[in-house]
């Protein structure tokens, strides 16, 4: 018998201004700034995408957060996974919307946390990021044991909240870049111990992973192997098992890289990226949504401890020229 899928939507809190973004991008900058300036790049390209139900909303408003929940419930979504940005030594960004959700008790809708553990730089939000030198806005750091404790205690109220999503009684916690944490085993031990000291059953840690990943220490031989479908299929097993061996309870799988390679050809895929990186060329990289979906998943995504990702649409052209065309809910 098949169980009903638990659909959780990632929640980006970028839709409200903060001083750091004001400093680097101008007063009032949010994710809407680039969305509103987007233009069609070819005939039939649907841009700009003007938000319908809620307009260009501001996440500081509780009314907006309530309406988001109504839309989510209508779509059959169980809860939100709020991205939070903990850079180490107590430094956070974009924390206000989630803090208000926890402190106010509203909306009454399930949630969990995802740690977006990556450095912020000027390359993140600019569609023309190849045209200027990258500047670090906030660096991701991992100070060690005391910071793990501070991180946990900062979110303890959320962890104790009855709305927090659990798996087998454990707190679901997603990590964006799981292999970037220098000693995840230590973090896991500390957090589970602190959880139990506070009457909680511990954590269910999920690491995000592409089922096909290009690494910095790639050899020419392994590049050639990636040119075959079979090698791409085998890649997922080793990627997922690597995270399990490092102590993660589950994997949130993503297949964008793999799907793009197979929808193009490996040679064309790498050539486009080479030209963009080396010669700063702004190439429109587009794929048919159906081709992406047909190549997005692997058999390992059916494992009990692997949680696949659903992408109903993808158009990153406000930031960079990458998009999927002709998406359909069918």
Residue ranges and their predicted role:
Residues 9, 72, 169, 308:
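Conserved, mostly hydrophobic/aromatic
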Residues 2-61:
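N-terminal regions that are enriched for targeting/export leaders
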Residues 105-136:
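Substrate-binding cleft and catalytic face of glycoside hydrolase catalytic domains
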Residues 8, 184, 190-323:
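Aromatic-lined glycan-binding groove of carbohydrate-active enzymes
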Residues 15, 56-63, 84-96, 180-183, ...:
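Acidic-and-aromatic substrate-binding clefts and catalytic sites of carbohydrate-active enzymes
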Residues 68-73, 80-81, 87-113:
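Aromatic-lined substrate-binding rim segments of carbohydrate-active enzymes
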Residues 140-166:
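An active-site-proximal structural segment forming one wall of the substrate-binding cleft
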Residues 324-329:
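Conserved small/polar residues in nucleotide/adenosyl-binding loops
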């Amino acid at each position: 018998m098949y169980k009903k899928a638990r659909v959780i939507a990632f929640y980006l809190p970028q839709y409200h201004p903060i001083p750091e973004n004001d400093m680097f991008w101008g007063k009032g900058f949010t994710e809407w700034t680039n969305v509103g300036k987007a233009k069609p790049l070819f005939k039939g390209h649907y841009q700009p995408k003007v938000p319908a139900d809620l307009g260009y909303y501001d996440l500081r408003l509780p009314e907006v957060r309530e309406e988001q929940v109504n839309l989510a419930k209508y779509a059959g979504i169980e809860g939100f996974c709020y991205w939070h940005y903990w850079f180490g030594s107590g430094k956070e960004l974009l924390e206000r919307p989630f803090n208000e959700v926890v402190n106010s008790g509203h909306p009454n809708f399930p949630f969990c946390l995802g740690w977006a553990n990556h450095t912020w730089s000027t390359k993140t939000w600019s569609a023309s990021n190849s045209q200027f030198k990258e500047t670090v806005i906030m660096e991701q750091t991992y100070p060690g044991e005391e910071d793990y404790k501070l991180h946990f205690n900062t979110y303890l109220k959320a962890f104790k909240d009855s709305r927090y999503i659990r798996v087998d009684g454990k707190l679901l916690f997603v990590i964006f870049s799981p292999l970037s944490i220098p000693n995840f085993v230590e973090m896991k031990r500390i957090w589970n111990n602190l959880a139990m000291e506070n009457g909680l059953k511990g954590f269910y840690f999920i690491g995000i992973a592409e089922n096909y990943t290009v690494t910095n220490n790639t050899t020419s031989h392994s590049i050639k192997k990636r040119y075959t479908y079979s090698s791409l299929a085998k890649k997922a097993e080793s990627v997922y098992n690597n995270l399990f061996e490092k102590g993660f309870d589950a994997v949130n799988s993503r297949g964008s890289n793999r799907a793009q390679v197979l929808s193009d050809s490996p040679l064309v895929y790498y050539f486009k990226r080479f030209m963009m990186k080396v010669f700063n060329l702004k190439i429109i990289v587009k794929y048919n949504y159906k081709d992406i979906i047909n190549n997005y998943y692997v058999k390992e995504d059916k494992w009990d401890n692997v949680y696949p990702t659903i992408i109903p649409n993808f158009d990153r052209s406000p930031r960079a020229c990458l998009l999927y065309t002709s998406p359909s809910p069918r």
